[in-house]
Amino acid sequence: LSVSAADKIHKTMDYLLANNKITWEGSLKATYYKWLHPDVLEYDNKEMWDIVPTIYSCFQFDTAISAKALSATKPHSVMDLSAANSLLRLQPDNADETPINRYIRYKNNHEAWVQDTIDFGLNDEERGVLWEYLSDAYGLADSQEKVMRLSMDKRVAGYTLKESNRLRKSIAKKSVKLQEEAKQQFFEYGRKIGTREIFLDYIWNVVFAASMG
């Protein structure tokens, strides 16, 4: 943690102590470990999550844009918080809807993702594959690991670990040439194992597109 972040934790403890929300345990370290250490927080405590969007200068969400996103996403789990943080960093060119805005739309209306995939033309089996990998982030690939795992699935493209890692690197770079080469290989591999063109198209142009540099 930075010095400024440590200072914020210290000040937070001062406020909590002053308002009798926690008790002094003899030292800052002992008090922190008793009340605020990640291992002792109650992650199923709704009240704790309800106040997260109201926190001033929340760690990793301390800009005006990220604070607004935090308020809109209303995280109620570590996974929600992690997804919001990851998706904020994704700003693909020429996107009609930013990843974070799509996440908010899907999170607020779980049926919206289902309907979008139906409208795109995906069948039940294809939607099931996406659900396996993307349900925890409401239909978005919020990490490069998910890009790799999807490409390795034998119902998608059947990549090897090495090939999926190369794909991950290629789509993250701001290189039209590398991205086009990666796209051609992805579609080629998918076609060879019988994956429908429309499914490959959705994964590339909707799921993977959010991670493109």
Locate the predicted segments by residue.
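Mg2+-dependent phosphoryl-transfer active-site scaffold
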Residues: 1-213
